[in-house]
């Protein structure tokens, strides 16, 4: 029998429909894989009993022909999504042993469609990080290694657990969130596919907030088709989220294999950074050639405010975070460290509960929102954001269907290698991805090649608002040309 953990989500779905195996068998195979891969630290909570019950329920539905589109599919859930009566911590000590009395909208929709939860996935604390090193549960180890080396690499962040679990065959797909690149960068680092949908496409209700005007949920999966299948279940209007957009959810899977002939693909000159590694440059050129060979037309475009995106992002995101994280005070839920009075209790709780990176961003955010600095920093950053959005609008007004860029400035790096003394070094990982969040656009990262040491590299496609289908069609062209990327198993 085929190793069930090596199947794509689409293959597993078809196999379940044909009754080649049961949902319980599929789930057991993944639970065994999770157990053997604990050294990767991708999961912060395994839920085997719950998974078996959900798989048995899926088998019963499949038997009567009532199975949903994800019936019996084992998924991992980023620990930012509230899961009812199942510990949810955002990988922060401050949430302690929090068991939400409610379920996030996105996970509710996944369970409605028959998916099986195998566990909660590691992430950077409160989704603040680009390497999954800020989690209170410790770093996630990338299933990929450099050729001939045993150095442990980061999987990217903040959705590092999601990307590592999918790459290592521990689940068939995973939920993730993206505030400045937290789906696309880990996908690129692990040879997986990650899509950040248009802002408002997926509900944010029940997801621990980082920066509310930037946060967006999306899937990480092994293939473009798999990510399309997952997004269809995750997306949809939710009256509980005022930023959720009320428009029909298309069947994204129909975009797979659709012709890209005649599509105009923008190549932004501002993304050609000084000191860009030659292998990233080559990959970008190669990706453009693949799209051209499929009938797309390449055009150079200009996004003149790109260079201001990263500094503006690191004002807007911390400002919103400082406001969102004010609610963690030890009073109503989560951890509490007592003091002689209530103010001291707040101080003690927040000092003990938040990690260094979260504290840094709260302080930056509080500073840029403070009297005397608000206009100089926050207001100016919001103006830059408007200009970035306008750059994209002008580009799309010229008939451009999508924009092709690198996903990351490098391949995965070693745990502890970056950002020690200078956090800006770590922040630069988001250089190609933050513009998409600032403009509220959809972006997909697709594995497209490998660096000189055999590590996967990804390309990013940026689309028009609510035109995820075009990204899936173009992404599949790159995927077909580049082939699949699977790490050699060393961890079990």
UniProtKB/Swiss-Prot annotation:
Any one Gene Ontology molecular-function term assigned to this protein's record: ATP binding
Function statement: Allows the formation of correctly charged Gln-tRNA(Gln) through the transamidation of misacylated Glu-tRNA(Gln) in organisms which lack glutaminyl-tRNA synthetase. The reaction takes place in the presence of glutamine and ATP through an activated gamma-phospho-Glu-tRNA(Gln).
Protein's UniProt keywords contain ATP-binding: yes
InterPro entries: Amidase (IPR000120), Amidase_CS (IPR020556), Amidase_dom (IPR023631), AS_sf (IPR036928), GatA (IPR004412)
Annotated PROSITE patterns: AMIDASES
Top-level class of the enzyme under EC nomenclature: ligase
Annotated catalysed reactions: L-glutamyl-tRNA(Gln) + L-glutamine + ATP + H2O = L-glutaminyl-tRNA(Gln) + L-glutamate + ADP + phosphate + H(+)
Active site location: 78 (charge relay system), 158 (charge relay system), 182 (acyl-ester intermediate)
Subunit (UniProt): Heterotrimer of A, B and C subunits.
EC number: 6.3.5.7
NCBIfam families: gatA
One GO biological process term: translation
Domain of life where this protein originates: Bacteria
Protein's name according to its UniProt entry: Glutamyl-tRNA(Gln) amidotransferase subunit A
Keywords: ATP-binding, Ligase, Nucleotide-binding, Protein biosynthesis
């Amino acid at each position: 029998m085929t190793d069930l953990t090596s199947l794509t989500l689409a293959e597993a779905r078809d196999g379940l429909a044909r009754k080649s195996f049961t949902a319980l068998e599929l789930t057991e195979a993944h639970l065994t894989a999770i157990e053997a891969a604990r050294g990767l630290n991708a999961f912060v909570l395994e839920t085997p009993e719950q998974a078996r019950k959900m798989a048995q329920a899926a088998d019963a539905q499949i038997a009567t022909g009532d199975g949903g589109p994800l019936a019996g599919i084992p998924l991992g859930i980023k620990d930012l999504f509230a899961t009812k009566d199942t510990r949810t911590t955002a990988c922060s000590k401050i949430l302690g042993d929090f068991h939400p009395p409610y379920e996030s909208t996105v996970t509710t929709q996944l369970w409605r469609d028959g998916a099986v939860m195998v566990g909660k996935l590691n992430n950077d604390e409160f989704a603040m990080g680009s390497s999954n090193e800020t989690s209170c549960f410790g770093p996630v180890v990338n299933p990929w290694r450099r050729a001939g080396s045993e150095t442990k690499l980061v999987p990217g962040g903040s959705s590092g657990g999601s990307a590592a679990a999918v790459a290592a065959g521990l689940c068939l797909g995973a939920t993730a969130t993206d505030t400045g690149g937290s789906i696309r960068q880990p996908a690129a680092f692990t040879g997986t596919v990650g899509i950040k949908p248009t802002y408002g496409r997926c509900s944010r209700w029940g997801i621990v907030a980082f920066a509310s005007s930037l946060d967006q949920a999306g899937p990480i999966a092994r293939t473009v088709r798999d990510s399309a299948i997952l997004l269809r279940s995750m997306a949809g209007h939710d009256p509980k989220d005022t930023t959720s957009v009320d428009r029909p959810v298309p069947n994204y899977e129909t975009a797979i294999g659709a012709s890209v002939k005649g599509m105009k693909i923008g190549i932004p000159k501002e993304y050609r950074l000084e000191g860009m590694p030659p292998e990233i440059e080559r990959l970008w050129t190669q990706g453009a050639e693949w799209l051209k060979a499929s009938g797309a037309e390449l055009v150079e475009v200009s996004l003149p405010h790109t260079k201001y995106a990263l500094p503006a992002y690191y004002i807007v995101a911390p400002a919103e975070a400082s406001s969102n994280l004010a609610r963690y005070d030890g009073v109503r839920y989560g951890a509490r460290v007592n003091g002689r009075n209530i103010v001291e209790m707040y101080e003690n709780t927040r000092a003990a509960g938040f990690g260094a990176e979260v504290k840094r961003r709260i302080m930056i955010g509080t500073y840029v929102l403070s009297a005397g600095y608000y206009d100089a920093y926050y207001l100016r950053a919001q103006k830059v954001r408007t200009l970035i959005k306008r750059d994209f609008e002008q580009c799309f007004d010229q008939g451009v269907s999508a924009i092709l860029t690198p996903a990351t400035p490098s391949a995965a790096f070693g745990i502890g290698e970056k950002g020690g003394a200078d956090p800006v070094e770590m922040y630069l990982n988001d250089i190609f991805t933050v513009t998409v969040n600032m403009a509220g656009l959809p972006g997909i990262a697709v594995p497209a090649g490998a660096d000189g040491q055999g590590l996967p590299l990804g390309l990013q496609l940026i689309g028009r608002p609510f035109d995820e289908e075009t990204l899936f069609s173009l992404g599949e062209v790159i995927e077909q040309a580049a082939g699949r990327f699977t790490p050699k198993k060393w961890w079990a």
